[in-house]
Amino acid sequence: MIVNNIFSRILFGILASCCLLACRGELPVLPSDGIEVGKDPLGGVHIKGMYLLNEGNMGSNKCTLDFYDSTTGKYHRNIYAERNPSVVKELGDVGNDLQIYGDKLYAVINCSNFIEVMDVETAQHLGQIDVVNCRYITFSNGKAYVSSYAGPVGIDPNARPGKVVEVDTTNLAITREVVVGYQPEEMVIKDGKLYVANSGGYRFPDYDRTVSVIDLKTFQVIKTIDVAINLHHMKLDRYGRRYVSSRGDYYGTGSNVFVIDTQTDRVTGSLGIAASEMCLSGDSIYMTSVEWSYVTESNTITYALYDVKQNKMVSRNFITDGTEAEIAIPYGVTVNPETKEIFVTDAKSYVVPGYLYCFSPEGKKRWKVRAGDIPAHFAFTTKTFQ
């Protein structure tokens, strides 16, 4: 009898486990408790929170996704793994861009060669777009546009030109592609034209120095604008000017930000400011720079604020309380478009978890929290985190 009773309990346990496993897909997502960091004291109306993509060091497969819920004041780490336990290798190797379009969240996973598409409210996997060595993503009229190095990762003086790929956001199918300059980076869209900054970073020391202009109707390159070597980021202000950052060559030519008039597609000047990362919010460009020099074998770090309406430098350091002394490697910067709170990430040594800092609009530290490895890319959402 005792043996039969034990056997019955074991059998019941096995059947119960099988039942739970069979129903796993129907179970609701249970979010982590999160870490209390503080609610938004300025009370944003529409924005509910912010996603943060942690790049992860190349080759480590440690790209992760975090979420700051400004309605509860809680920070949730590594939510993709939590909400997608069946996805092999989770997010992949080196997250390079993060954007929201409609009800979808798009994470560009550079060295894994795909764009991960998620539900913007739950961060649950919806689909994947395969693009070799993908870099940045932007959107217009139901289409996504992805810049691609179009070849393997690595320095190569004979690296092939890159491309821009068009994707239908309804079915995530690639519809068109066009060849541009070498190692294309960030893009902006204006008046039916897409502008992409070409770096030529793999072709050192023979960098590219152009912006390719694509007609979105024909999807052909209609113009090439000569700007400066090793271009990277691009932002568009409300006055019809584009701001393009150049990394320089890390020797005699320093980093700078160049201004292009959208009416004439000509370079009209430069800001004389180094910029590794840029965020345009209203009439202000926030720029962080970690400018490495092989001559001095050291970094020069700056936190600049520039007024695009008045065309003048506001400050060489938008952090006003001395907190910059805590930050080893400023790696990402963004500004809440409603509250104007400033967010800066610290990559530390690139191989350990970094930190996210929140500053008041006046540049005073509100809080900081540990993030993933190399925290870098942001996306604000008006949707409630489920």
Where do the PLM segments sit?
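Bacterial N-terminal signal peptides that target proteins for export
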Residues: 2-11
